[in-house]
Amino acid sequence: MDTKFSGSANYVASRDLMETVNIAVALQKPLLIKGEPGTGKTMLAQAVADALGKKLIIWNVKSTTKAQDGLYVYDVVQRLYDSQFGNAGVDDVKKYIKLGKLGEAFSADEQVVLLIDEIDKADLEFPNALLWELDRMEFYIPETKETVQAKQRPIVIITSNAEKELPDAFLRRCVFHYIEFPEQEQMEAILRVHFENLDEQLIRQSLTAFYWLRELRGIEKKPSTSELVDWIRALVAGGVDPARIEKEIPFAGVLLKKDKDLQTLRKVK
């Protein structure tokens, strides 16, 4: 089992990213990952877990998510229901406490990788509300008068699409890395992870067209890595001759998701 992250069979990581992951693990600090959509931020956590032989726990953050959700939930409604119908054990408050994803990570007997995904989707108070728990690796449950302490400090990876600026106090506690969009050479390596025995001409033509499209003036939503992978799947499924890609972009709707971008493409292809 590896003790340091050096990528995985399914994830191509740059040297800078590998070094940053290992520094965050060594310093026992959360790793904050930013980058445009489709650069592999979320997949990084799975790759780290796979490479280090750890279980992955995922906390998907939404606009309605509160920090409390990650700690525990007290099902007071169920307890009230049980008390009305005389169900046994209603006095045992622990029955109605369900740990959230952070609570699960703290309670795990072995070290886990905890992914807090898209933290910037929540309100501005969300990151600050987690400062104590991430610093001290513990939280208090007043309903049971118990403190939940991390048995093993989890490896915490936090992703952000930079939709909102995160508080300075939160940033100071993190190791930060911005995942740059892959250069063509690295992208080719990524494609070879996803596809075995892919036609060499198809790889060259599709990559040339993809990067040309990303640089095309007027494109508002540039296609991402995941959309490139889907596009190549479409090209293979459609039996497209690689030579055709020099003249047009087949199945452009797999790459471009805005009407305006499709219209921009039609003007030049």
PLM region descriptions:
Residues 1-269:
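C-terminal regulatory/interaction module of P-loop NTP-utilizing enzymes
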